[in-house]
């Protein structure tokens, strides 16, 4: 019996949001090869369960459009397009890491860059998933002023994912930053309404509102903990579920 058939999973198709900061590791800029290697092995384990896996990558480890606009007065729209190109670099790096561990993947970009990847088309992306390939979505939604968190919510909804996974540096949603406040309380579950009313900045309001409107749960967990993603897919591990 294969591992995929022997492993009972809670989800069959999921979207994972991978922030640029997560890929940066301790380097302070760019992609940490060790982080890419560890992440690719974690993704390979989940993929081996037969789970259809879609990723949306951020670009904050290379360039943040909003920050550049605020700090230097640069035009926000142009900065956001630069940020989209940063997500492309991360997506290609992640694709290489996955294929190094023998996991087939495809990068699909919201803006056409046909020399290096496919342009995102929903039906094409779903077909790749059905063929057992990991789909890596780059360039956000393809328009400025929208975050990659919003892109994650949008792609998760339109591709019919069972849940949207938000990988962070802590094991769920807390009432305050647990690294700064020892009294911070971790939630096992929290509603979209409470998340927004308490102003807990896990994802931006547009992303949370999209997921809420379409009743797609958001799972917040520690992406840096080896095996945590696979544990949750099996129904174990520490995480917070954001729900309607």
UniProtKB/Swiss-Prot annotation:
Look up the record and name the pathway of this protein: Pyrimidine metabolism; CTP biosynthesis via de novo pathway; UDP from UMP (UMPK route): step 1/1
Stretches for region Involved in allosteric activation by GTP: 25-30
Keywords recorded for this protein, A-Z? Allosteric enzyme, ATP-binding, Cytoplasm, Kinase, Nucleotide-binding, Pyrimidine biosynthesis, Transferase
Instruction: Quote the subcellular location field of this record.
Output: Cytoplasm
- Residues reported to bind ATP: 17-20, 60, 64, 168-169, 174, 177
Where on this chain does UMP bind?
59, 80, 141-148
**E.C. number(s) listed in UniProt:** 2.7.4.22
Q: CDD domains given for it? A: AAK_UMPK-PyrH-Ec
Cite the InterPro entries for this sequence: AceGlu_kinase-like_sf, Asp/Glu/Uridylate_kinase, Uridylate_kinase, Uridylate_kinase_bac
SUPFAM superfamilies tied to this protein = Carbamate kinase-like (SSF53633)
Please give the activity regulation comment for this entry: Allosterically activated by GTP. Inhibited by UTP.
Any keyword Isomerase? Answer: no
Cellular component annotations (GO), alphabetically ordered: cytoplasm
Molecular function (GO) terms for this protein are: ATP binding; UMP kinase activity
* Gene Ontology terms: biological process: 'de novo' CTP biosynthetic process; UDP biosynthetic process
Task: Keyword check for DNA repair, yes or no.
Answer: no
Q: Report disulfide bridges, numbered on this chain.
A: none
Catalytic activity, as annotated: UMP + ATP = UDP + ADP
Which Pfam families does the entry mention?
A: AA_kinase
Q: What class of enzyme is it?
A: transferase
Family membership noted in the UniProt record: Belongs to the UMP kinase family.
The record's note on quaternary structure and interaction partners says: Homohexamer.
Q: What does this protein do?
A: Catalyzes the reversible phosphorylation of UMP to UDP.
Q: What is this protein called?
A: Uridylate kinase
Q: Which organism is it from?
A: Ehrlichia chaffeensis (strain ATCC CRL-10679 / Arkansas)
| Gene that this sequence comes from | pyrH
């Amino acid at each position: 019996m294969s591992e995929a058939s022997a492993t009972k999973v809670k989800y069959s198709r999921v979207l994972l949001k991978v922030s640029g900061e997560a890929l940066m590791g301790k380097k302070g800029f760019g992609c940490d090869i060790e982080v890419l290697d560890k992440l690719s092995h974690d993704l390979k384990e989940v993929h081996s369960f037969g789970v259809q896996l879609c990723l949306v990558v951020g670009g904050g480890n290379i360039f943040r459009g909003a920050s550049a606009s605020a700090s230097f007065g640069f035009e926000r729209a142009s900065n956001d397009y630069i940020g989209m190109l940063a997500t492309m670099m991360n997506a290609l790096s992640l694709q290489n890491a996955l294929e190094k561990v023998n996991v087939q993947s495809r990068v699909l970009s919201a803006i056409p860059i046909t020399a290096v990847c496919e342009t995102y088309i929903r039906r094409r992306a779903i077909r790749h998933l059905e063929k057992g390939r990991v789909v890596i979505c780059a360039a956000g939604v393809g328009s400025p002023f929208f975050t990659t968190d919003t892109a994650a919510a949008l792609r998760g909804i339109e591709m019919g994912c069972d849940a949207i996974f938000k990988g962070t540096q802590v094991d769920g949603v807390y009432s305050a930053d647990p690294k700064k406040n020892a009294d911070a309380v971790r939630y096992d579950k929290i509603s979209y309404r409470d998340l927004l009313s308490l102003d807990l900045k896990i994802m931006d309001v547009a992303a949370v509102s999209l997921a809420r409107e379409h009743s797609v749960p958001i799972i917040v967990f520690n992406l840096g903990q080896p095996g945590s993603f696979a544990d949750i897919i099996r129904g174990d591990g520490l995480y917070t579920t954001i729900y309607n």
